[in-house]
Design a protein with these regions (language model features):
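Catalytic metal-binding/acid-base residues of hydrolase active sites
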Residues: 50, 74-76, 185, 214
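Conserved active-site carboxylates
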Residues: 1-18, 28, 32-33, 37-43, ...
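Active-site-adjacent beta->alpha loops and helix N-cap segments on the catalytic face
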Residues: 25, 29, 51-61, 162, ...
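Ser/Thr-glycine-rich phosphate-binding loops at phosphate-binding pockets of nucleotides
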Residues: 18, 44-50, 362-366
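Residue-level marker for buried hydrophobic side chains located in beta-strands
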Residues: 12, 45, 207-209
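Conserved phosphate/anionic-ligand binding catalytic regions in large, soluble enzymes, centered on
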Residues: 103-104, 208-219, 352, 356-378
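Glycine-rich loop at the start of a catalytic domain that most often binds anionic cofactors/ligands
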Residues: 26, 52-68, 83-85, 221-225, ...
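Short, hydrophobic/aliphatic alpha-helical segments
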Residues: 196-202, 341-358
């Protein structure tokens, strides 16, 4: 607190794990957001361990109360030579990555996918080598561009170890690098705080206050202890120092936070919050551009293929009622800018049939004469009284579902078709 004015400094929590950090986080995304808003936080980050699973719920909850949200993730980083499953020693540290923009979110997503596909469940550790020299196919993830990187030192910090880590960290992440300070009312908090302060000063790196939050209120501590015991596979009474010594890993009051952290470290949380501009609302369906031939726009190509299909479906002439339906549907599709979606499904179906893979659209797509003319469905909407708006409407706010069913005997083809389409090459 500012002693002169009595005004509490602003604060944003940038290290917060929900119950999507399995057997670590004790509170739901909704509980965390509600508590942060009640405490008057400027914003909050969701940083589950090697996961973005909690981000959608956190996004919805934060949006409902007008609380700025940063999407990120937490990783344990162990020395390159540390044996899996063994104590990594003082060289280990925590890493909080925060997406600054959509590109950063994409890079963070790729990093998480890479680790989850290449590590046993629950052991999604990184090493300095992985971050600095990822495989060639993932070379663009070096230093995880467009993400803030916060080094969370092992407690209690050692000057020699921290200096070496910060030299490497600064070289890799540059201006995006920050040094995290966690204060949880433990015996060596004072010494830890001084080591972090001195190391940051020597390296010229900004220090940021972190709560290392795993629960929204202190009374969740028994639940967190229970989850720790389950994770370790032993009774609570035998967990000893593996249990958190107190309930400080909750969203504390701003008065308490102001007492624990230097003003600069608190101000840094808000500067980082303001520099992160990504929202899940920025995500949209994206479709390949290659499906539209040169000289066409998605609108003109969809119209061309639809009318060509109509002439095949109705060789004796397209009935006026069908013509009107086609014009109505094409106009609505163009207005909603869904042409790439319809063309993507059309391209998949064309590819499947070129390989004699039996497939057919079903469900509410049968309400659409455009789908019928494109050959996606085989039910003539003219012969039914189905409601087109059940399939596509302005109010829905997202592309319709077009289920393309492949028969059980074509399992290999069913897998090969989308794989080939996504890769842009024919399957072997």
């Amino acid at each position: 607190m500012d002693a002169a004015s009595g005004i509490l400094p602003d604060y944003a929590e940038l290290f917060c794990r929900s119950n999507f950090s399995f057997l670590h986080g004790a509170s739901s995304a909704e509980e965390l957001v509600e508590r942060a808003a009640k405490q008057g936080y400027r914003g909050i980050a969701i940083t589950d361990e090697c996961s973005l699973a909690g981000a959608p719920r956190m996004h919805v909850a934060a949006k409902a109360v007008g609380l700025p949200l940063v999407v990120g993730a937490y990783f344990g980083v162990t020395p390159d030579d540390a044996a899996p499953g063994h104590d990594p020693g003082p060289g280990a540290f925590g890493l909080v990555l925060l997406a600054q923009n959509r590109e950063g979110y994409g890079n963070l997503s790729e990093l998480i996918s890479w680790r989850r596909m290449n590590a046993p469940k629950g052991t999604y550790r990184l090493t300095p080598r992985m971050l600095a020299a990822p495989p060639r196919a993932l070379a663009h993830l070096r230093g995880v561009p467009d993400c803030f990187a916060i080094l969370v030192p092992t407690y209690p910090a050692r000057a020699d170890v921290l200096d070496a880590q910060l030299a490497w960290f600064d070289a890799l992440f540059g201006e995006r690098a920050r040094l995290g300070l966690v204060q949880l009312q433990r015996a060596l908090d004072g010494a830890h705080r001084e080591q972090v302060r001195a190391a940051g000063e020597r390296r010229g790196m900004h220090i940021v206050a972190l709560g290392d939050v795993t629960m929204h209120i202190r009374s969740c501590k028994p639940l967190q202890d229970t989850m720790t015991a389950i994770r370790l596979g032993m009774p609570i009474a035998e967990c000893g120092h593996a249990l958190a010594p107190n309930g400080e890993q909750h969203l504390r009051t701003r008065q308490r936070i102001a007492q624990l952290f230097p003003a600069d470290a608190l101000a840094q949380t808000c500067r980082m919050l303001d520099a992160c501009h990504f929202s899940l609302d920025d995500l949209r369906y994206e479709y390949p551009h290659e499906i539209v031939p040169a000289g066409h726009t998605p609108t003109s190509y969809l119209a061309q293929e639809t009318w060509a299909g109509a002439r095949r479906r109705y060789p004796d002439g397209v009935p006026d009622t069908v013509r009107q339906r086609i014009e109505f549907e094409l106009a609505l599709i163009a207005d909603l800018k869904y042409e790439p979606y319809f063309l993507t499904v059309y391209d998949i179906v064309k590819y499947a049939r070129s390989k004699d893979i039996l497939c057919q659209g079903r469900g509410s797509a049968a309400n659409s004469v455009v789908c019928y003319c494109l050959g996606v469905t085989e039910v003539n909407p003219q012969q039914s009284t189905l409601l087109f708006e059940r399939f596509l409407s302005r109010e829905r706010g997202e592309p319709p579902d077009i289920d393309v069913y492949s028969t059980p005997f074509s399992t290999d083809g069913r897998h090969a078709c989308p794989s080939a389409f996504c890769l842009g090459t024919s399957p072997p």
